[in-house]
Amino acid sequence: MRSLTTSALTAAALILTALPAVAGNWYGLISAGLVHSDNNYKEAVGAVNTANNQNPVNDADNSNVTAKLAVGCRVNDHFAVEAAAWWFGKSEQDHAGIQAGQPVNSHAEFKGYGLAVDAVGILPVTDALSVFGKAGVALIRIDGKNNASEPQYSFSKSKTRLAPKLGAGAEWLMTERLSLRLEYEHFFNAGKESRDGQTFIMPDVDYDTVTVGLKMNF
């Protein structure tokens, strides 16, 4: 995974360096959809909660709304480069139980943001329809916060990581300037598990997104 990150980062740097000199068709994109945060917080904290407390409750809501704003350049019929700002929504984790006859509980939230750069390979199917694949890298920040009835388990932390990413989708040209886009994107290792003593702070995180967007050709 380290070599994949290094390769993706190198490619991103080359893309960004070349962008000002690229002659092509520029466009903007705004998209929204659903994101799933694939993380291990519920399993890790839930195991401790179940082992130490009576009547344990371990709930997680790892799906939310996502959105991105992007700008890109269509270099030719088969290649484009894109840069995007992302909002990954938030995942929420609730744990509760009874300890020594007293209720204990915690509520954790993890919010994600990111900046991404992609190289996009395009395959026209018809004059109006094309499919594409993309690969790139994203700089992702996750803000984590836990409010717990036992103060030693409360925290507020932020972590930033470089995450390789892959995606695929389809695009339909509705008018000369306006297109409709559907795409799936996966962000690898957006978050890395970390602890502060015995307190579990940051989970391992991958993001999966499915979005629908409008692309405007400039």
List each model region and its residues:
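Long, hydrophobic/aromatic N-terminal blocks
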Residues: S31-T66
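Short, conserved structural micro-motifs that define repeat-unit consensus positions
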Residues: K68-R74, K165-G169, S179-R181
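Gram-negative (and chloroplast) outer-membrane scaffold detector with strong preference
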Residues: G24-Y27, A32-N40, A67-A148, W172, ...
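Flexible, solvent-exposed coil segments and beta strand-coil junctions
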Residues: G46-N52, H95-Q102, D143-P151, F188-S194
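K/E-rich alpha-helical interaction surfaces of small helical-bundle regulatory domains
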Residues: E171, T175, L180-N189, E193, ...
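Cleavable N-terminal export/targeting peptides
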Residues: M1-W26
